[in-house]
């Protein structure tokens, strides 16, 4: 399990052709390539949260099935540092490294040589997070900070896989709450695919850490949940009718604690339990209003965490027509392990593609996009990419990035038609797409920025701020996107089935079933220049009749 972090390539070359030649080798924008490994072996995942550092030690058998050998945890409050002051103190960095080092020693005692150290909300939001990574590196440890979009995607996929056996219909129409002490992820699932995802700074201990108990953190949490209007956004994205019932899926350590108070113990990641609605409602009411009192001896921090978790669940439980509440046993460590196993067993396969497309379509509807046009462009860009892929190098997940850019390239028209490409870039830069890394997100936004007539220039901050690898990716994606957009000028149908491609020599023949090609030829002449510069191919439009 490789924990190395690839250093970003920096630098810029203004000339498009030179930039493409310099970076002609295969590009990889994933979290990191995995070493080839063969089970059985022991491995571990160390998770640095806002309040606790946890380690799970697993053994993978020859069939890649995981058995948990040991779990360790130590309380360590990073949230008070980050959410109150914005950084992690030097003293706490040293303590954290020592604690993680002890966990690594424990993994090695089992004979494990592959392990992964990940950090979530608190370290992710610290302005000195790069210093934390550097200090870990100096100690011989490699720390990976999970971006919010990565964390939610891994957890969602792992929960979906775990529920597929025991609660198969739970994620047909559902709202999933991934609760941590530092952050809250809200996911909307419609017809079995994710269509909404939002990270909220509403973790169960966040207001306690930021304000202190004297500032009534529970009331602050209630106000924030109401002000976010997340229920309305969920309804819009899910196209949910007013009284259509949903499953409420609660995930995370606070959720498992609430389930345990109902007598439901979740020992394994694959476990899940359906909670009795009346009993669970009474439990969260007691936690919410009595701060955990009456449940025996309980640590004040744990009581505060349970109260906040109850407030969060109550907000969604009262606002949605919940037919059931389900709590799976999945953890961040289990989700990270499952993702790594999948990458090793099925490299290049992305099970999240359908969900990302659904999220993009929901965002497009929010900004009144032309769904037929977006689908046409997505279909055409995919055909062009597949035709070019054997002959040119592309970033990992190019098909995924092209699909996202195709669906969202015109959302800026919601603001202004004339400069919609710039507004599309701005809107995308302020939207977080699950399943994409920060680098991939920048690539998609910049490709959308240049889907119109203007070419990328170093004078454009949105282009000059990219790394050299990212610039090449943007050029290739934008070049394909412009051609696909031009081809849709006269397509009357919501699919690009009439488009056929033929690559002969240095000419890419675009064959369409249209009698009048004049409008399409003009559009292609205006927008096809970048494609010819980037790929060195002439575009030739012809009638297929």
Which role fits each region the language model picked out?
Residues 323, 535-545:
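A short amphipathic beta-strand at an alpha->beta junction
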Residues 489-494, 534-537:
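Short secondary-structure junctions
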